[in-house]
């Protein structure tokens, strides 16, 4: 049978299941794939059972071992990539490293338990790493006979979401049973379809990478006699065209401007380079020694150099190749942003004396050189070239 071509006509959205251990995230993931395969059969909609999702392979993302299951499915309107991570630590790592970029998530809460500690932690992490849209699935409602109890649990979840600045009063809450839907109970299958309609409607289509402002991390710089300076790298987002005015940002207090006079890929001239392309960009108005690896080429005004920010970080365990000992306030490692290391110092939150390998924590960082950063920029924490942590910028301070 010929391989079917990947259909790009439907908008693509990344989502995931989050919530406390044993509340039914993986069962719900299995139920979504199974019910869609029954109701909307297609080459994409294949049922996945609990065991195959639960046996997620280990992946290494920036030196960190993460177990994550990736499944895909489609509704009539959209194509989805769905991530489900079996263990709590896998979620924390996934979200902080940006390994799993979710446009929205389904928060699974067992009606029998209500919100639990990891429910709270996953909501906080979603807020920190910029997952803006959550939908609640109250699972296991078949095990609760008391309507009032269900109402109380729903109120509790809504209050918790509001506490972390989500629209707790307004966001959708769907009550169902993932297990019953998986077993083929049509009442509960209907609820899974209702959940997917809600996901279609409530989670907005993400802005495509090519529509965002240009960001090109500089990896290499050389000069071509008689033509000027070339900076090369992989375009992170946006597009670059001949005659564009750009800014060079980072490692200096001031930004400098230049004009693009050529774009090349694989030694061929292009009219434009797009997000994902490895390009060389010929620049007018900049000398070979005025641009270096670690800076970024960006759309003017879109990103600025900063030295102080708050970050949410995960510190690797000894087994992952991280530190064997805790670190304390004013720890000074290197922060690796995109293509370069910059030394910085860490201030720990009030009341936190030390950070152990395997912990996640919110830190204040001050770098010795400014770097082009914004909310959502990811980084690694390194010591002598060895990764000891991974994080994401949550707030710019200076």
Curated annotation (Swiss-Prot):
It comes from the Bacteria. Residues 139-142 are annotated as: G4. InterPro entries: EF-Tu_GTP-bd (IPR041709), EF-Tu_GTPase (IPR050055), EFTu-like_2 (IPR004161), EFTU_2 (IPR033720), G_TR_CS (IPR031157), P-loop_NTPase (IPR027417), Small_GTP-bd (IPR005225), T_Tr_GTP-bd_dom (IPR000795). One of its GO terms (molecular function) is GTPase activity. CDD domains: EF_Tu (cd01884), EFTU_II (cd03697), EFTU_III (cd03707). Its EC number is 3.6.5.3. PROSITE patterns: G_TR_1, G_TR_2. Residues 177-179 are annotated as: G5. Residues 63-67 are annotated as: G2. Residues 10-207 form the tr-type G domain. Keywords: Cytoplasm, Elongation factor, GTP-binding, Hydrolase, Magnesium, Metal-binding, Nucleotide-binding, Protein biosynthesis. Residues 84-87 are annotated as: G3. One of its GO terms (cellular component) is cytosol. GTP binds at residues 19-26, 84-88, 139-142. It is found in: Cytoplasm. Residues 19-26 are annotated as: G1. Mg(2+) binds at residue 26. It catalyses: GTP + H2O = GDP + phosphate + H(+). HAMAP family: EF_Tu_B. Belongs to the TRAFAC class translation factor GTPase superfamily. Classic translation factor GTPase family. EF-Tu/EF-1A subfamily. GTP hydrolase that promotes the GTP-dependent binding of aminoacyl-tRNA to the A-site of ribosomes during protein biosynthesis. Monomer. This is Elongation factor Tu. The gene is tuf.
